[in-house]
Amino acid sequence: MAPSLAVRAASRVESLTRHVVADASGSSLALNPTASNGGVASARPTPGGGPGSLSVVDNRTGKKYELPIEPGGYVPSAALKQITAGGDGAGLRLFDPGYVNTAPCKSKISFIDGDAGVLRYRGYPIETLAETSTYLESAFALVYGDLPSAAQLAEWEQTIMRHSALPVPVIAAIEALPHDAHPMGIILAGLNALSTFHPEQNPALQGGDIYKTHSVQDKQIVRIIGKMTTLAAHAYHRNTGRAPAPPNQKLGYAENFLYMLDAGLDPDHRPNPRLAKALDVMFLLHAEHEMNCSTAAARHLASSGVDVYSAVAGAVGALYGPLHGGANEAVLKMLARIERVENIPAFLDGVKNKKEKMFGFGHRVYKNFDPRAKVIRAVAEEVFSLVGRDPLIDVAVELEKRARADPYFVSRKLYPNVDFYSGLVYRALGFPPEFFTVLFAIPRATGYLAHWREALTDPDQRIMRPQQIYEGPWLREYAPIEGRRDATSDQMWQVEPSNASRRRLAGVVSTHRAGTGDHAAFGRGDVAPLSSATREVEGSDPNRRAFGRGLGPAFSGGVVAGDATSGVDQLMRRR
């Protein structure tokens, strides 16, 4: 894959030039293509065996019911409501923790066959797109259903880049956050701040029908995709104490992102095109993955009619969770702990004996090799050829090889997933672990937007309101407080006293009372915020490429697997 990456990167400027020429000739962007750009390779097998019916006998009553099986291979859950057996008269419901076998919507955006290890965007295999397409081209297909023509792609790319700048008040809101704020928290704050702009396009202010206009939908889509990298650049540099370079609308999407990170005051700086292409492929691979936790959150929020910025922010908040977006950092820590290839057998024995955890293997959906992991391994080799080989890649490759040959892992269908190699790529590109989830959120915003747009025209769409299985007390009388005893549950009142509370209880008189709550005088527990002068000094230190505390080894002076690369070295690597 490495040679083709270099070739495609070298031809990118020429390709964009052709698109610009086509756009200058007066062509327009048709955002609802009707002709399919790519034939159907084969017919889809009948989902779930096809339509029919399911005969159910309720052994409680002896009654027999016929439940319809729809052409998509599913049973409408509402059909169960007819099954009753006295009691409270309620119909039968499904108990499905985690929505393991529940489909809340129908979608045409992406397809996964977990047993075969298949992922397709709008029918296009992910491997083909990674080899031949770009992130923004694939984003167009995800949002609008088909690959764009040359003229459409040119206008799509240019429109997104024209909307890459942030409003000044949004930048001010970011700069008001703590200097060591987590970058995902900054992304969330930025998206929520953006939701307050353009009130004329907010359904809560203008009525629920405002998004039924395609032009209004499309404007929000290009705005969010365009601004995600700029938000990320500000999140990155909020922690370094420097300002990102302004967006360069003449560059490609991933290229402009690296430019904002590294150009500083040099408007002529250009990122390495091969590194930019590698990052573009990573964006493409992470753009969409059907009904995952954060995408489901986006559709859930959108069902309420909330503005799209709030819906995307809620989805990004779900991605912030360590069980969803933070697994690649855990993989890095695992590989660093193994350290050398000769330690792998002992580590695998520890996994089998439940003494070790193996991250980056297995998936909620895939019971085969995650197709994205294969591509990312090739991208890793391309990046290492430019910036130097990370010794942990040898550990990763050998760990994969031995796990795939071990009956213990094969029988449990534990194969490498997308997180196994992605952290190594991001570390080689000079990003600290705290930023990995941001690099996930940037492209996944496209998937959220595709689902948001699809939900707007879904005839089955209604506000999502799952049911619950109630198991609490049935009916209780209210007791006056004078006659109550102390609650005995071990789950009550677990708040630890703050330092300020301890001082007050010790009899120390605090002069910082009004409006402080239980926090110390500094307002953030027992840690004093840095003065503005201190922040400037820390931010200007060239060896601090990223985040003040809890840095990855390459950014804090620590060593992992022999890598003591400083932050400034990472900057020079990307250049």
For the regions a language model picked out, list residue spans one by one.
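Hydrophobic alpha-helical membrane-insertion segments
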Residues: 535-542
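Short, low-complexity, intrinsically disordered N-terminal modules
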Residues: 531-533, 565
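Low-complexity, intrinsically disordered Ser/Thr/Pro- and acidic-rich segments
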Residues: 538, 547-553, 557-558
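Non-transmembrane, aqueous-exposed alpha-helical and coiled segments at domain scale
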Residues: 2-21, 27-522, 555, 567-575
